[in-house]
Amino acid sequence: MENTIIFKDQADAANKLFEILPKKDLVDRKTLVICMSLESVIMVDEICKNLGLNYEMLFSECISAPNNPECTIAVVSETEEIVLNDALIRAFEISYDFVYGEAHRKYEEKILKNIYKFRKGNLIGDLRNRNVIIMDEGCESGLTALVCAKTLIKEGVKSIAYATPVIASDVALSLSSVIDTIYTVDKILHFIDVDSYYESKLDATDECILQILEDSPRYLPLQKQQKGDEE
């Protein structure tokens, strides 16, 4: 392994990423943070509490090659935006009908379920003319970041930044064509996988994540519910 930073856990990653963020600029621009995955909620919630900024979830699901669940060939977002890895699709001679069929199935079976569970069934809030920064706990292929960026562009955001503790160097370069600014603790030339850069991971079960979101003063979709409970 290269001489890279290894994070103790998501809380450690949150602290180190927070240190390099342009805090005043993000606050002055009233930036909305977009959490890209349920696994990243522990880190993102901590950063948002420290920044004093609100966050939203943007749900997406990976589409795997037939008979190879470890090989991601596409990613679909909650607006049914799709990003394809055409090179892999062609190399494995996978039909595009299969890919789009799987994308729709993932949307129906996984994404809609998550929207109901973690956002009470509501669509993502109005993002027009918002400055947003997408965050996740690590970036290996960039497909999820790319589908999130494309989704946000279609939603009419004003600017998109991306913050992640670790990212593959080549992916950071390719994402720079669609993302305004990338903030990262470490760019890694020979990227292994995200979990390799964490000593351990804090519990991120659905129940744990839901509890964090319900208790958080910064998770935008549930703020109205919290206020209603207090009244």
PLM segments and residue spans:
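PRPP-associated nucleotide enzymes
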Residues: M1-E231
